[in-house]
Amino acid sequence: MLKIVDTNILLDFPQILDEEKDIIILVEVLRELDGLKLNPSFETSFKARRAAVTISHHLSDITFKDCYENLTKSVDDKLLLCADECFGELITNDVYLKVKAHIKGIKSRGYGSSESYSGVRTVFLQTDENRYHKDLDFMMNNH
């Protein structure tokens, strides 16, 4: 089965190109990676450059598609269209994109770590540290 890979997978798990076969990368995904290499975040720009190097090492193993260039749809919509037309599987860790794929009856899956980012970090304070924070002007999270 053909596998259409989203930008976030190439950023976070470029080794997918070593581990999976029949990979399709849209030119729009390459454009996103190219733009991200200049991102002010060192981590993001590093990941974009690392993805580019990994892709360059696998050029003969990857199918690149540029057939949706004239469409004014989002990159996500183009990924869905490609997965649908190619009867492929969309590989993304974008939750909303996986939901859209499910709605359209397109097979999709995540890749890599099953731990998703919650946006929350739990910090345990010692009793004396906790006393310091009680005088600050913010409300403690009760959840």
List each model region and its residues:
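Active-site-proximal, substrate-binding regions of enzyme catalytic domains
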Residues: 1-89, 95-142
